[in-house]
Amino acid sequence: MAELKVTQIKSTIGTKQNQRNSLRTLGLKGIRQTVVREDNAQNRGLINVVRHLVTVEEV
């Protein structure tokens, strides 16, 4: 199965609580931190909520 490389590029200052929760669920705690997650509907939904704060690449 494909994987997604998700990197946080912007700060969570001034964002809504649900966006901060989505980043934490993805495993991102700071700017320039990168995680590799499975490409499934759940992770795609979390990424969609914070699409303006992260970059996504297929691995």
UniProtKB/Swiss-Prot annotation:
Keywords: Ribonucleoprotein, Ribosomal protein. It comes from the Bacteria. GO terms for cellular component: cytosolic large ribosomal subunit. It holds the Pfam family Ribosomal_L30. GO terms for biological process: translation. GO terms for molecular function: structural constituent of ribosome. Belongs to the universal ribosomal protein uL30 family. Part of the 50S ribosomal subunit. This is Large ribosomal subunit protein uL30. It comes from Rhodococcus opacus (strain B4). The gene is rpmD.
